[in-house]
């Protein structure tokens, strides 16, 4: 997680939300909730949000990596990856996919992921749902927390197909 400190820390707070301020600040450091890496040139690359990280059988999985692989498929317009509850692993990867081509099947997606050199087997989606659209913010970012809520309903209704 990316954490920062500044002499102006006292200027940062959650307005009228003391609980959140205490949660995000610790001993003068702001815990941003962003996950990233620091390279040899001292640049920080943000790779996702801590809240979006999936923990499956003790492995940390970042949705952006799986989304990038899914989005390489020629019949995929875009995708969103989230974690769904699993009794054995804690969470497993679920993929929501918007198709460019209506002939796209779950089997094609599964085959694409399992043959990708970019994904280890623990990162393969275990459930898929082909949808018409994904929720986005006004700036175009996918809203993963809405997808997690949607997945709860889809699991209850049998719409997420486990593979």
Predicted regions and their residues:
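AMP-binding/adenylate-forming catalytic domain of the ANL superfamily
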Residues: 118-142, 158-163
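Short arginine-rich
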Residues: 149-156
């Amino acid at each position: 997680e990316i954490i920062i400190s500044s002499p102006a820390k006292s200027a940062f707070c959650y307005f009228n939300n003391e609980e959140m301020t205490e949660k995000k600040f610790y001993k003068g450091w702001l815990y941003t909730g962003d996950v990233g890496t620091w390279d040899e040139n001292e640049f920080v690359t943000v790779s996702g949000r801590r809240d979006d990280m999936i923990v499956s059988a003790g492995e940390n999985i970042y949705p952006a990596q799986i989304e990038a692989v899914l989005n390489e498929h020629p019949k995929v317009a875009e995708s969103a990856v989230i974690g769904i509850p699993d009794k054995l692993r804690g969470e497993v990867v679920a993929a929501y996919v918007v198709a460019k081509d209506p002939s796209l099947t779950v089997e094609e997606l599964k085959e694409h992921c399992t043959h990708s050199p970019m994904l280890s087997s623990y990162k393969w989606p275990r459930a898929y749902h082909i949808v018409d659209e994904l929720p986005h913010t006004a700036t175009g970012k996918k809203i993963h927390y809405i997808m997690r809520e949607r997945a709860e309903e889809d699991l209850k209704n049998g719409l997420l197909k486990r593979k």
